[in-house]
Swiss-Prot record:
UniProt zinc finger (CW-type) residues: 490-544
Subunit structure: Homodimerizes upon ATP-binding and dissociate upon ATP hydrolysis; homodimerization is required for gene silencing. Interacts with HDAC4. Interacts with ACLY. Interacts with TASOR and MPHOSPH8; the interactions associate MORC2 with the HUSH complex which recruits MORC2 to heterochromatic loci.
Upper lineage: Eukaryota, Metazoa, Chordata, Craniata, Vertebrata
Coiled-coil ranges (or none): 282-362, 547-584, 741-761, 966-1016
Catalytic activity, reaction form: ATP + H2O = ADP + phosphate + H(+)
Record note on what altering S730A does: No effect on phosphorylation by PAK1
Segments of this protein annotated with the region Disordered: 530-563, 577-793, 850-870
Keyword Transport: no
Function field: Essential for epigenetic silencing by the HUSH (human silencing hub) complex. Recruited by HUSH to target site in heterochromatin, the ATPase activity and homodimerization are critical for HUSH-mediated silencing. Represses germ cell-related genes and L1 retrotransposons in collaboration with SETDB1 and the HUSH complex, the silencing is dependent of repressive epigenetic modifications, such as H3K9me3 mark. Silencing events often occur within introns of transcriptionally active genes, and lead to the down-regulation of host gene expression.
The protein, known as: ATPase MORC2
InterPro entries: Chromo_MORC2_6th, HATPase_C_sf, Morc_S5, Znf_CW
A GO biological process held by the record: transposable element silencing by heterochromatin formation
Amino acid sequence: MAFTNYSSLNRAQLTFEYLHTNSTTHEFLFGALAELVDNARDADATRIDIYAERREDLRGGFMLCFLDDGAGMDPSDAASVIQFGKSAKRTPESTQIGQYGNGLKSGSMRIGKDFILFTKKEDTMTCLFLSRTFHEEEGIDEVIVPLPTWNARTREPVTDNVEKFAIETELIYKYSPFRTEEEVMTQFMKIPGDSGTLVIIFNLKLMDNGEPELDIISNPRDIQMAETSPEGTKPERRSFRAYAAVLYIDPRMRIFIHGHKVQTKRLSCCLYKPRMYKYTSSRFKTRAEQEVKKAEHVARIAEEKAREAESKARTLEVRLGGDLTRDSRVMLRQVQNRAITLRREADVKKRIKEAKQRALKEPKELNFVFGVNIEHRDLDGMFIYNCSRLIKMYEKVGPQLEGGMACGGVVGVVDVPYLVLEPTHNKQDFADAKEYRHLLRAMGEHLAQYWKDIAIAQRGIIKFWDEFGYLSANWNQPPSSELRYKRRRAMEIPTTIQCDLCLKWRTLPFQLSSVEKDYPDTWVCSMNPDPEQDRCEASEQKQKVPLGTFRKDMKTQEEKQKQLTEKIRQQQEKLEALQKTTPIRSQADLKKLPLEVTTRPSTEEPVRRPQRPRSPPLPAVIRNAPSRPPSLPTPRPASQPRKAPVISSTPKLPALAAREEASTSRLLQPPEAPRKPANTLVKTASRPAPLVQQLSPSLLPNSKSPREVPSPKVIKTPVVKKTESPIKLSPATPSRKRSVAVSDEEEVEEEAERRKERCKRGRFVVKEEKKDSNELSDSAGEEDSADLKRAQKDKGLHVEVRVNREWYTGRVTAVEVGKHVVRWKVKFDYVPTDTTPRDRWVEKGSEDVRLMKPPSPEHQSLDTQQEGGEEEVGPVAQQAIAVAEPSTSECLRIEPDTTALSTNHETIDLLVQILRNCLRYFLPPSFPISKKQLSAMNSDELISFPLKEYFKQYEVGLQNLCNSYQSRADSRAKASEESLRTSERKLRETEEKLQKLRTNIVALLQKVQEDIDINTDDELDAYIEDLITKGD
């Protein structure tokens, strides 16, 4: 259908309000500024100046200018700027950043309301004016863009329509900051050379307080984000100078802000122990599939056109037949040539399509570079570039997401081409979120491999950072500014700087004098102390980054079988736990619950539905009573003090309760008969195999209870420990078949204090169990309780567990006691999360677990000390309670151990001898008591030994010794530096002498033999050696 047939159809209209809508894509303001820098880079500019010009009559008080020396634009190129979405850079093989034809408009409109562009190319000077102020003042809905052009030499207008040119210039003079033609020409003269572009943005966006969003006052050398605190904000989020320094992975353009050069960085050259890993994957297909679809569409259209042209040529040839007139032959030849041309184009498009289809199946390869940022360890994470342009920064992956010190300070760098991942329009994210997550997951796996390869964890993470001056425990604190630490950091990371003339990167040799040196903005190759790289003609040396290998942990068949067995066992335990529990989510579920009642005669009151008031908690003397006489009272954490409640004479039912964590259940208090003691059960389902303790609550804390205990034995109540690990209290009272979970008011309040932040909703769980009515013996209960106590002592042990043929450190967080085995639950300090869970159940005493050395006393936590203090206070509190409540203390009496320990004289003598040896070994040289006198002291004399003076003199002597070592080391370092300088001076003198000698030899040879041609030192050496050989 001809285009003329479409002339009556509706067309999409672009209103000037779209200019604002389009600009909202830039949430990050520096991203809008970077769009204008990207345009200069794509125009092959070698320099861009970003500066502000004060204009108090404009909104914001200044204009923001971007001046580059790129290729510039002619009138046709400038006209394409105002076509939204049109870009000449959009080709599959393009390495340019711009792809969408939208950056200039969206970026400039995000910064201000209006912008004016001046550009020069060849003999033309073009001005482009895009103003929302003009549209608002004139009440125009459509987007109108004045675009006048002048001749660069004569400054005469270049136009076919003088009236149109006059209207365009009149609008510029009226609504732009430049009111006359002379002022406009002055802006053109700011563009150096024959080509370049100047973009000026004015009427800037303001904040709610009326100030501009960009701050150019706080730092005259920088453009900063207004009202952004430096604390907790990455430098690149606050300073445009810092953001521009890392904007490109391989900077080849000088960036000046307010006339001061930005020291751009190649991140891989700024890291300690960089290492590269090659990553290959077939998962990145979205962009490649789009390219294949485009190529197939283009190839299909080209094929149809070629077939149609060939068909026309054949038809014309048949129709002409034997007509051999000149006009007929010319017409036939033209049609045939067109058919041949279209066929060639179709074949080319077909080959492109086939190549893209093959490329779709080929895996994509990326290079991950990791290194440690020893200059600022808190600035870590992944920097992800697209076609050398920064898209995402400080992305945490792999072990960094866990928040520990593992992989802390490590920076990763990757450059992703367009065919792998496509960025969003604002160039602050990637369009395909699924493939981007896959990239981050792969980087996390390689990051864990890098951390293992550099072996920082094996040497000690804290020790490593101390070596570079990170002396504070606060991770975000900067390193020490002492000279020795600065030198240590400078020795590991050589200075890499860009020449201001040739734009090549040079790595400078390490010199002590350059540790705190500031290099000038106009640094050039001739300033390089390296003689091989001290001229711009020398080729740029590529950074030599070691190549790492990503190794997946290969499991043996036995390990796979063992892991599978462990998973099956865990799932079975979860299934059994679910089968034994009934979740209560509503009152209807509670009514359906089958609760068994006891087989007592009906002399007691029947079970009632209405709830009664909760009974008071048990007295502390009963709760803390030991399970056997020789046992010590169980310590209670100092953070949980509790008072002994007053015991009422009315018999009430005691209840114990515990609350689960994240996926835990709340406890249900079922209706019960009054004055009827019940067995209590507290069950926690947060672990697959909770600990078991036996409780005999058959005696209530009331001496007037009408019900008597049939057993004449002394009843012992086991201690219920309050630990973070889940516990389970199982009844041991005879003639009871009913087990229900009820709540204890006091313990529920304590649990709520500890867990109110994590547990908001839960569910009731009632555990139904059936026990034989046979009476359980007290001795069996005591043995189980003792075994459980001994097992509980294992909690907190530091152990090593073998996983996949490697040992990992961890801590015992839970203990499970079985019939014939004790199992530990070990939480690892760090393991690769892709192959090993964060914790694991192991059998105590097996080959896969071993104990670590206990920590030193000074590292004991405050909680341990508080528990120790509680142990001392416990007996006193219990005695006080026993005095206040004689009836209860008669039922459960705690007999103190009054047997005195016999003195072992041999042990005392041995300890005295050990003390003598220690004092003699560390005796200061000038101490008034000699070693001989010390050896003759008895135990009474040692008690009065002046330890304070002893320690003082020892510390003074040790300090003097350290100072002498330090002074000797400093003198040696100075001597070594002086020797090094002397050697370097002698080396330079020798090289100069050698060079003069070679020059003289060449001059001598040229006098002897005029046609000799020697250009390099190597040729001279070879020629002399050849002469000596021939002479022999």
